[in-house]
Amino acid sequence: MESVGDPRDGPSTERAFEGQPVPPWTEQVTLRAVVASVALGVALSSVMMNLVFTSGIIPSLNISAGLLGFFLLKAWTRLLDQLGSPGRPFTRQENAVVQTCVVACASMTYSGGFGSYLLAMDRKTAEKTSTGDDSSASVSEPEFGRMMAFFFLVSFVGLLAIVPMRKTMIIRHRLTFPSGSATAHLINSFHTPHGARQAKRQVSLVLRSSLASLFWSIFQWFYTGGPNCGFTSFPTFGLSAFNRGFYISLNGTYVGIGMISPHLINVSMLFGSIISWGIMRPYIRSKRGIWYDADLQETNLKSFSGYKVFCAIAMILGDGIFQLVAISLRTIHTVRHHQVAAETLRSFSDVDAMPRPVMSFDDRRRTQVFLREHIPSTFAISGYVVLATVSTVVIPLMYGQVRYYHVAAAYAFAPVLAFCNAYGTGVAETNFSAQYNKLVILMFASWIGIKNGGIVGSLVICGIVSSIVSTASDFMSDFKTSYLTLTSPRATLVSQVIGTAMGCVVNPAVFTVFHHFYEMNPNKTYQAPLAKIYRGIAVLGAGGLELPKYCLAISATFFVLALAVCAMREVAAHGKWRAEPYIPSVTGMAVSFLLVPAVSIDMCIGSLIVFLWNRNDKLGSQVFGPVLASGLICGDGLFSIPYALLARYDVTPPICIRFLGRVQNDKLDAFLASKAKAG
């Protein structure tokens, strides 16, 4: 494998901190850091849970966690100073510990499958998709106690699986881990005089945008006293387009996600919405009663929903398989290139004039600190074996659809997937955990079979693998942050363990609130598109579904098109074509098949804001754009818990604003007039 190094030109970062001693790891994990992490972990877990239930798209909140952690602890130390009892100085290492702990807690909403495999197990999803697979063996209700026990069993294994590889990835191959590096540079900048002033402006912006988004959500709620009511149902492009889902809802969450997501993803989603909701949906609906039973509900996978869901699955699988093959070939090529280079160097080993890489001051200091506090590999390996053994015994008792050999097989190959995923994340921030999840579901659903509970069984195994693979890549990214901020690896491990333990309790509790009012109707707020995809894959793999007419042929066509588009993107990138930035993302298009087009339109509005901001003030856009986006997402997400509780206890908004066509309005006026005369 070739080394991917950090750029060493330019001013030294560590020279600015040379006079500051690096505190021992026991002083980096402090009580105030843990308290701040708990507060931020609960808040961001609620925000992330709102995202997995609405769009299924999860942006990185690392920057938000680092920024808010800096704000809380800085305010804490300032308050103590004013009270005359100053505490220990607030260091960048403590800031990194808070960021690691918070992200470990909040990211479990995705790796824990709360909007995907876990939700796909329940009876409500089975009934809404109506595939005839809602027997007791094919459903499993998400109970709080069982969820918490399951996550305590599987969530810590991913940490131990990747610990032995930290030196190889961070020191030897110098993988960049873009997200971890960006977070580290941000934290480093906070703790310089200029960076502290800029951080104050960023904190002010995130608070103001969060409050604005929160109050906008509250204001909108008062006018949603019925179906299709409120400003979110404004027929921006006319009633005909509105009936097909094309309108602007100005949802703070989606606009914020659009500001963070690449332009290509947002435009790809809009393109996919036009294909699925604008072209494919009306055509297939015209075949109702011919291709599928007209008496079935649209959400039934044997009716219209089957075309929509399985076309999306085909595209996602096509993209995933292509990317897995591509990264495997790249890895083999890189290994061979490294071996050839090593042999060449050995053949010239007697030549003293060979150029040798010289480490910069920053690299020397960071490497020294990173290697100083050792985490024994024997501890990690033995811990993995012990936890895997316990899980192999206990999980079949919790879920009767799986056997001990299914669990053992998952734990046997999961570390390989974890390494591959962490390596891809380190090179180019390419996280393939979702693709691994889908392949695992297909394999184990086929192995277990529909009669033996293959649907739930494969989803449980998916949960085990997902927890290991996703956690491992996130943890290695945190190691990169700790390397660049001179944070002890032991402090990083301890903070990750604390954050994971928090997530095992906080996320099931938050999920329980959301699950009470979860609706699968695509016109409702909580669409949970990934739950339908994951259950559809499990049903397909287990062989328990008869698809509607021509569904398989149409899905196969989309699968081939996905491979073609992926191949075109690869060739364009290799050949440096000018058209390469305009080739759409397959997964972006696929996700939009299961979301109303209003989501992709709002995300494109976010993209447009960033584009115009970049043209006016590129530096300001780069510094404050992600902060503004995070504020919009957090503000709207914070209202999700009160919204859930209001819906849970049937509290109805007092006003309904609805937009009608002229003909409908005339009929309504005539009806009201007749009622008035009769009265």
Curated annotation (Swiss-Prot):
Its main location: membrane. Residues 1-21 are annotated as: Disordered. It is a multi-pass membrane protein. It comes from the Eukaryota. GO terms for molecular function: oligopeptide transmembrane transporter activity. It is found in: Membrane. Residues 1-17 have a biased composition (Basic and acidic residues). InterPro entries: OPT, YSL-like. The chain crosses the membrane at residues 29-49, 51-71, 101-121, 144-164, 211-231, 255-275, 309-329, 379-399, 407-427, 441-461, 497-517, 547-567, 593-613, 627-647. Keywords: Membrane, Transmembrane, Transmembrane helix, Transport. One of its GO terms (cellular component) is membrane. May be involved in the transport of nicotianamine-chelated metals. NCBIfam families: OPT_sfam (TIGR00728). This is Probable metal-nicotianamine transporter YSL18.
